[in-house]
């Protein structure tokens, strides 16, 4: 992959499970927090996570809980959980994000399993069940997935936190579902690749975006949960 080759990027912002793999493969250099004057602004709630328990490599950039959002004007299905996405009445009427890790996770939850099970038999069974969702899926797209819901092209969608926020701003009439099977949770974080050509620039950028007012602007724009405690007072209601 591009990051195994290295040398092209000074800073990478990635999902937690990807970061875990990158660290395991030696693709991430240890973080020198002393070079980030705004480091103490970070919220410890989003630190010391499974992918970086000692905070040796990463700086959190955002967190979120993917959710189902649906248009009650386009379907009579009362959606209360992931399992409802399989309802035949939603044929060709569901949009999904293009993240297999997440979509496989919600399928596992419909089976009463953990998002993070490592049981291969269970994972294979989830894959088989996921195939049965195909008739209901109209689109799989990671970027601006909410647009299909906003426009009325689909009746239901499984969206990232930022997409949920955007959808509700455009269509307050949409319904948000906190699935009865349980919620997923993820964190994005930044790291400096082992072969970063200009680590100084990466540290300068990390310092800049974690200044309170700058961080607030970032979180208001991306629509994820704020991971910078000092920025909270600058975020609008």
Residue ranges, per PLM feature:
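Short, hydrophobic alpha-helical packing/hinge segments within bilobed ligand-binding/sensory domains
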Residues: 1, 19, 82, 145-148, ...
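Short, well-structured alpha-helical segments in soluble
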Residues: 2-7
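Extracytoplasmic ligand-binding site segments that recognize negatively charged/polar headgroups
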Residues: 8-153
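A ligand-binding cleft/hinge motif common to bilobed small-molecule-binding domains
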Residues: 19-21, 150, 156-173
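Generic alpha-helical structural context detector
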Residues: 105-109, 165, 207, 220
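Periplasmic-binding protein-like
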Residues: 124-132, 170-194
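Generic hydrophobic alpha-helical scaffold/packing signal
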Residues: 146, 150, 168, 193, ...
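Mature extracytoplasmic/periplasmic domains
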Residues: 183, 188, 193-237
